[in-house]
């Protein structure tokens, strides 16, 4: 897929009542303390399969639905096209995301992930799960609701071993189809694979390996990488 612009930006937006939550969120997820500026250049996201350089856009607004109305205008199309991901920090019971997501997602680039981070501590995980069920097949984009409680740690997985909270957001970024990532050598990947591995880790590794495989343009190199990773992961299956 050829894009007119490089998709190497992640936008983190909060409405004004939750600016403090955004500050801690940026520190916890991106280890970013430069919250007083709107653009933090050349950040690095790295896992065992690849690393990618991106710019972190930080913003706040009085009202997210009003911000969305401006964001989906034709004038903002160049901005939308460079967004690898958009993270909205809000109270989902106040924002009513079901109403704004329809128009928002029609305008968003199809390779942009969207995460709505709920900071209302009265919202239970069952309510988040229900929203994710509704939106899971609505668009081709990754759209996910995540509970994040600043005052107390969020349980990082459910009864099925699926990631929750910040761990789930990290997983979304890890498995995003980055178009400008630097693939790490297969030898380094093999060195980092432990002797024992839980099933959920195997699944994450398969997802990341798929991303690397798709980024290798030479078919022979891609096939060689696939065979190497199949051999490595077969030890744990």
Curated annotation (Swiss-Prot):
Signal peptide: none annotated. The keyword Chaperone does not apply. One of its GO terms (biological process) is vesicle-mediated transport. Keywords: Chromosomal rearrangement. InterPro entries: Irc6. It comes from the Eukaryota. One of its GO terms (molecular function) is protein-macromolecule adaptor activity. Involved in gross chromosomal rearrangements (GCRs) and telomere healing. Belongs to the IRC6 family. This is Increased recombination centers protein 6. It comes from Saccharomyces cerevisiae (strain RM11-1a).
């Amino acid at each position: 897929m050829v894009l007119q612009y490089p998709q190497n930006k992640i936008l983190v937006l909060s409405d004004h009542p939750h600016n403090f939550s955004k500050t801690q969120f940026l520190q916890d997820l991106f280890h970013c303390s430069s919250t007083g500026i709107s653009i933090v250049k050349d950040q690095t996201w790295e896992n065992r399969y690849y690393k990618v350089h991106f710019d972190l856009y930080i913003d706040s607004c009085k009202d997210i639905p009003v911000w969305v109305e401006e964001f989906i205008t034709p004038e903002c199309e160049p901005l939308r096209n460079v967004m690898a991901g958009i993270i909205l920090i809000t109270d989902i019971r106040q924002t009513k995301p079901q109403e704004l997501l329809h128009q928002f997602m029609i305008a968003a680039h199809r390779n942009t992930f969207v995460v709505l981070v709920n900071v209302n501590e009265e919202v239970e995980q069952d309510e988040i799960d229900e929203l994710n069920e509704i939106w899971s097949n609505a668009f081709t984009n990754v759209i996910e609701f995540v509970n994040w409680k600043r005052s107390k740690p969020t349980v990082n997985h459910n009864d099925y071993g699926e990631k929750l909270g910040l761990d789930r957001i990290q997983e979304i970024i890890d498995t995003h189809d980055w178009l400008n990532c630097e693939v790490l050598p297969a030898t380094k990947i093999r060195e980092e694979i432990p002797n024992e591995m839980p099933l959920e880790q195997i699944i994450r590794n398969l997802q990341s390996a798929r991303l690397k495989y798709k980024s290798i343009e030479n078919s022979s190199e891609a096939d060689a990488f696939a065979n190497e990773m199949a051999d490595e992961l077969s030890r744990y299956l």
